[in-house]
Amino acid sequence: MNTNRITAVLLAVFIVTMFFSCKNIRKKPTTAITFDTIVVARQIPLLQNDSTLPYADVDFKFIYPVKFGTPEDLARLQQIFVGTFFTDTQYDTLSPQEAVDKYLEKYIASYRALSSDYYSDKSRLPEGETPVWYYYQLNISNKILFQNDSLLSYAVEYSDYTGGAHGSYRIVYYNIDLNDLVTISEEDLFIPGYYKSLTDIILRSLMKKYNVTAPDSLLTKGFFTIEDIVPNNNFWMDNKGLHYTYNQYEIAPYSMGPIDVTIPYEDLKPILKPDNIIERFFPNKENKKSERDPI
């Protein structure tokens, strides 16, 4: 009888424990993110009703979150994505689709305002010739580079042509702390006064990449000046390190394209804050399973 009673008590304790454990599991907030994409591919004639005129090719590929945590969390995450995609805070109060529509509307109005200049330039050309510099292009896209339960890193790429000798291209990175839903900058990672030390680390990394032994030797590789090579806050993060990019004309000529440099966390240890968030984001930096392929 005592044995049966003990068994019954233990079974009851087990059931109660499992019940509350399951409740806790269900209540635990999820950091899983579901994404959707808005794609725009339009050819905008300089005048609305004249397809014989120059036009602007406009292409957007906007990846944005549609499911994440609570409704408030999702709204905040979408706000960050919208604001960083269009690089203007006037859009971050809009839904992703509203922001795309508004940006496109403003771009079309700005492009078509050039029509009077087009006819003025055309009148100065030999008959039958067209001012081809009014053929414009605009491409904006983003892609997810890294994601785990605490961190989301992504890139926004811009390329455009507005009639000059060549188009322009730039890539900008953003890192979001998924726990606090804020973007991360160098100041969040490094101790006060980090700037000079980080500059030296970046410089050494570039010297290694370009296989030179002295900073001035980078000038022979095409870099403008050594003084231009400084931290620029344009980095993304994964469990390997920080990945910096310097865009065209930032530290080198257009012909060299964007300059990329990766810095392992081991090299950054002396300037990381004592309570640095790197350890929180990557409790086991050797674990490659938290990485994901770019979207």
Locate each region found by the language model:
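Bacterial N-terminal signal peptides that target proteins for export
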Residues: 1-10
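Compositionally biased amphipathic helical and low-complexity segments enriched in hydrophobic
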Residues: 11-12, 269
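C-terminal motif of bacterial Sec signal peptides marking the signal peptidase cleavage site
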Residues: 18-21
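Compositionally biased intrinsically disordered regions enriched in Thr/Gly
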Residues: 23-295
